[in-house]
């Protein structure tokens, strides 16, 4: 990603020249010029778009997980909690879920992702409850049988942080 206010063709030509000297080349299919103030673009799993702050009027980059990245993590959660995995002990399922979700969250946590992480947390809770309900043949939706204390306290499910790190105090983040 290269940002510039103008002369994009000249900058792109310069980049190609420098890479050519290093005997490297740009992939033409993946290389594109975008006006980030008007349209979004995806880069390394993030969707980046310029937004205006309604209070100050200043433009800032809004960096969120891409739709493809969210779809992928939800697919992984579904795969780990599907009916085929009912024979596997719940401790193993929770361990595998924690590894996948902790890794994904660690990568995407530093963008403007509070809304996406809140949605993912609700999705994860619901999938784990559904898995446990099917495993133990419960007919209810599972909120009473498997409350938050059970999911996070007893089972040890990873609690997805739903607020961005810069909105928390240093003590709350575990930093000094």
Question: Model features per residue range: what roles?
Answer:
Residues 1-176:
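Non-catalytic terminal/accessory segments
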